């Protein structure tokens, strides 16, 4: 008999950002029971777990709101001890601002954080020493709205999605420089294959999420990292925003869907979709409906479970990736219009 996708998860924890809370909450990965929460600075966005130092990093991007519609950019990273559920330190990156995307090279002890442009510098990636928790470098991306980042397994190259800019920045992390601009019609989530041969980019830029029939076709652009060029598109029905690659080679794509409001009113968020591709063959394997406005996706280390955080419905959806069946919905308490955002899966301590 095949084991349940939930089996063997005792002691594992899922951390979830409530952007409006503002909190980081912790859930038992075996049964989704809420274990507690931690109040943090407004407004937290993304999470990244460092398994070597057992620390959870959280970006604080805006004082309120979201990209291009906010109440001012923040400058902080929050460092959390997830086992004690306490804030260890607040790292201020000023004058850098709007930290958002996070990618960790745990072996080399480097954390990469996207930041937006200011009057005197373009957007970029700030390099943090994961041991000292201090900035040790900055790499310009050449774009204003650098927002998501993915690093290859070798820790040598990063790919940065730059929102409305018509390119993704390829960065040489050893030289600290841009090596290529990959042409795309704007970009959202980004991921890199395990062998580093391909990058995957959600495109086009989602803008207001309303889309348009005359715009570029939505989907995932497949980038040959050797030539820094798009070689294929994995089509989606609706705008693709978050991307995530599992340890088993599944490419998880969050599709944002909208609908007209009552009586022809303003466009509003409708239930979204998790679409799954085989990253190697590029075959579409299927999908499952999730909550409104999926913004972040992660998975369990064994690649059996997907977690989809949906901002507008303030829910996290747990999906069995073998059966593509929804197992549970976690309702994240939201104090405002926005809710669930950043996610991190925390395996139990050895």
Functional labels for PLM-detected ranges:
Residues 1-350:
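Predominantly soluble domains enriched in secretory-pathway, periplasmic, or organellar proteins
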